[in-house]
Amino acid sequence: MATQPRIGSISRVTSESDIRVEINLDGTGTVEIDTGVPFFDHMLTAFGVHGAFDLKVKATGDTHIDAHHTVEDTAIVLGQAIAQAVGDKRGIKRFGSFQLPMDETLCEAIVDFSGRPYFVTKGEPDYLVHSVIGSHYPTVLNEHFFESLALNAKITLHVLCRYGRDPHHITEAEFKAVARAIREAVGPDDRLTGIPSTKGAL
């Protein structure tokens, strides 16, 4: 596994958003986040801190309409930056999972840096489709964020809400669980130094 910090830096500009992301997978949880959506900033901060990633996100988008494009496009760019940073995956554990409690809520994330993008989510209460946190973050965007992240990071990601009631707690537990699962998966495998696949490539 490389001794140099694994850093990904991606920019993406469309008619709907301008997103710039830099992530250091070998960081210490230093974050600089500004998306124009305060609750989303809070979630990305938690993602960086609990993943122990150094994370910089600067996003501007059409938030005067809603937060959808900014959140989804940030997930696209973050996923691409993670894929760039992890490189050929040599020496990583590849798999990671984490169960995270937050008061009445328990969420779980399972990840495989397989190179085969796939996303599954289950268990969020139906009312999260209609919930809005902080006046500008509809929790229906949780699924959009994690799906876009998985597809662009080229990982298999399962996000499961085992139980919970508060939309804030459920959302935050999901973000933190995903961060911790990714942190485990990209960590060094002390016993295997090559690419963690019988195919010899991921």
UniProtKB/Swiss-Prot annotation:
GO biological process entries: L-histidine biosynthetic process
Reaction(s) the record says it catalyses: D-erythro-1-(imidazol-4-yl)glycerol 3-phosphate = 3-(imidazol-4-yl)-2-oxopropyl phosphate + H2O
EC number(s) from the headed UniProt entry: 4.2.1.19
Gene Ontology molecular function: any one: imidazoleglycerol-phosphate dehydratase activity
Keywords: Amino-acid biosynthesis, Cytoplasm, Histidine biosynthesis, Lyase
Subcellular location field: Cytoplasm
Cellular component, GO, one term: cytoplasm
Family statement: Belongs to the imidazoleglycerol-phosphate dehydratase family.
NCBIfam families linked to this entry: PRK00951.1-6, PRK00951.2-1, PRK00951.2-4
Protein name as catalogued: Imidazoleglycerol-phosphate dehydratase
Provenance organism: Corynebacterium diphtheriae (strain ATCC 700971 / NCTC 13129 / Biotype gravis)
